[in-house]
């Protein structure tokens, strides 16, 4: 037995023209959206042919099925275009990471703080990683003080999503932008 494969094509979501079978009559809507009424399937296809467009089954489960006279290619194009616009409007939230050390100097701290503010204003989350090396592990309280200082400095821009916690040799805190 041979298995029939469709080469990546998905079936059309709506039946069109001659694909609409098994129903004697349909509820028809015209090109401009005006209701024509219940007509036989043959009359509906003739009206669509006269207009030079397609007969598209909109609601197959209705009784009788609802069909519309329209340009199906244009309909699919507009549908794809609107879906693309919706996707474009969605903002993908990213997590930006800034790395600190317990001995980060004041100027470096201010530069990294400005970057954090910029990330949060753009609507992205910020992950703050504080890495301890060597003997710095003995002074974890200095690192936690630094994370608390960052939290206090960014209080008007962000809310803490995950509070500072140690993971191996680093302390991690995640900030999310405040809702406006």
UniProtKB/Swiss-Prot annotation:
Keywords: Cytoplasm, Initiation factor, Protein biosynthesis. PANTHER family: TRANSLATION INITIATION FACTOR IF-3, TRANSLATION INITIATION FACTOR IF-3, MITOCHONDRIAL. IF-3 binds to the 30S ribosomal subunit and shifts the equilibrium between 70S ribosomes and their 50S and 30S subunits in favor of the free subunits, thus enhancing the availability of 30S subunits on which protein synthesis initiation begins. Gene3D superfamilies: Translation initiation factor 3 (IF-3), C-terminal domain (3.30.110.10), Translation initiation factor 3 (IF-3), N-terminal domain (3.10.20.80). It comes from the Bacteria. One of its GO terms (biological process) is ribosome disassembly. Belongs to the IF-3 family. It is found in: Cytoplasm. This is Translation initiation factor IF-3. GO terms for molecular function: ribosome binding; translation initiation factor activity. One of its GO terms (cellular component) is membrane. Monomer. It comes from Shewanella baltica (strain OS185). Its main location: cytoplasm.
């Amino acid at each position: 037995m041979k298995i029939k494969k469709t080469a990546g094509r998905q079936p059309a979501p709506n039946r069109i023209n001659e694909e609409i079978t098994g129903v004697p009559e349909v509820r028809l809507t015209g090109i401009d959206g005006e209701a024509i009424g219940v007509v036989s399937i043959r009359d509906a296809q003739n009206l669509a042919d006269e207009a030079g467009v397609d007969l598209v089954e909109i609601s197959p489960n209705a009784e009788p099925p609802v069909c519309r006279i329209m340009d199906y290619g244009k309909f699919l194009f507009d549908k794809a275009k609107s879906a693309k616009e919706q996707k474009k409007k969605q903002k993908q939230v990213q997590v930006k990471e800034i790395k600190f050390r317990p001995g980060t100097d004041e100027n470096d701290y201010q530069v990294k703080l400005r970057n954090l503010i910029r990330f949060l204003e753009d609507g992205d989350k910020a992950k703050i990683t504080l890495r301890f090396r060597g003997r710095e592990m003995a002074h974890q309280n200095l690192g936690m003080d630094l994370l608390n200082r960052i939290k206090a400095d960014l209080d008007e821009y962000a809310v803490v999503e995950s509070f500072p916690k140690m993971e191996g040799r680093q302390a991690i805190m995640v900030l999310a932008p405040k809702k406006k």
